């Protein structure tokens, strides 16, 4: 599942612009008692790094 997330391209919106990017890192964030989400880290063409939730996990 991790390779699917890292090899897929996602649409990231930042500063009013939209980018189609591949994540450089992804991880699961799941607080106790709540459904988890997959957060991915993206590097924009201008060098900035942004995070985005790319998937929600079932409870």
Swiss-Prot record:
InterPro entries with a match to the protein in the record: Cren7_sf, dsDNA-bd_Cren7
Top-rank taxon: Archaea
Keywords: Chromosome, Cytoplasm, DNA-binding, Methylation
Record-annotated disulphide pairs: none
Entry GO terms, CC: chromosome; cytoplasm
Entry GO MF terms: double-stranded DNA binding
Record's subcellular location: Chromosome; Cytoplasm
Predominant location category: cytoplasm
Pfam families on file: Cren7
PTM characteristics: Methylated at multiple sites, to varying extents.
HAMAP family tied to this protein: Chromatin_Cren7
Quaternary structure note: Monomer.
Function statement: A chromatin protein, binds double-stranded DNA without sequence specificity. Constrains negative DNA supercoils.
Family of the protein in this entry: Belongs to the Cren7 family.
Protein name: Chromatin protein Cren7
Organism: Pyrobaculum arsenaticum (strain DSM 13514 / JCM 11321 / PZ6)
Gene symbol of the encoding locus: creN7
């Amino acid at each position: 599942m991790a390779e699917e997330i890292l090899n897929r391209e996602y649409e990231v919106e930042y500063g009013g612009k939209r980018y189609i990017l591949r994540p450089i890192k992804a991880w699961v964030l799941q607080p106790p008692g709540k459904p988890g989400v997959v957060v991915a880290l993206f590097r924009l063409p201008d060098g900035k790094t942004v995070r985005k939730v790319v998937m929600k996990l079932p409870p």
